[in-house]
């Protein structure tokens, strides 16, 4: 019953989102929602139009409702399901700025003696320093500031809050594009116990046809301090993202802002040290 309630939450939010977007489309051009959406469209028109990858946080500014599901297999061959995976609502409230309001993931364990529960609340802010669409330089540079609050229960979260500053860049050539992010996790307290993590993710994408985006990611974490001091883990992540499929059209048949994007892939461990062996990643999004 608990899992069913968790899965129903994104569906309820999505239904409310569809109603809001429909109201915006039916309202006049001078309404608040219409002006807001026009500003968002202008902001996104000044950047590349690649699809958001499976794992890497895109340097592009996006406005969407997103939910992910991850099944990890740990070194003891036990499965861990992570429902929603800390995704949620992404908004572009101002020019060059995106804010992400994420719901805490629900973590379910195969092991009977390990308690299931919600993880930590996370948040993220983006500022786009530079953006150029496909008709010009087809490139982007963005800074992130992420963070987490220790709201997790039953050992499914951290003991302390943390901040994660990140720099993200991307460059495209016709149907091919590369993006990379580099950042570090900085505990607000208890740094000696938690240590620090350097996160480096890169992705190569190819736009095959109208909706298909095959990709290959490299996701790396380097540990400094704590019990894993000096260790590193790296995953290769092949995947496929399909989108954006338009769900609305205007009177002239032009696609509206509301769309559907979904995809799947698998993280495959490349290093001897790893906190989990591999993971299946599923994503669903409603850009609006």
Listing of model-derived features with the role each one plays in the protein:
Residues 1-35:
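Cleavable N-terminal export/targeting peptides
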Residues 25-288:
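Transmembrane beta-barrel domains of Gram-negative outer membranes and organellar outer membranes
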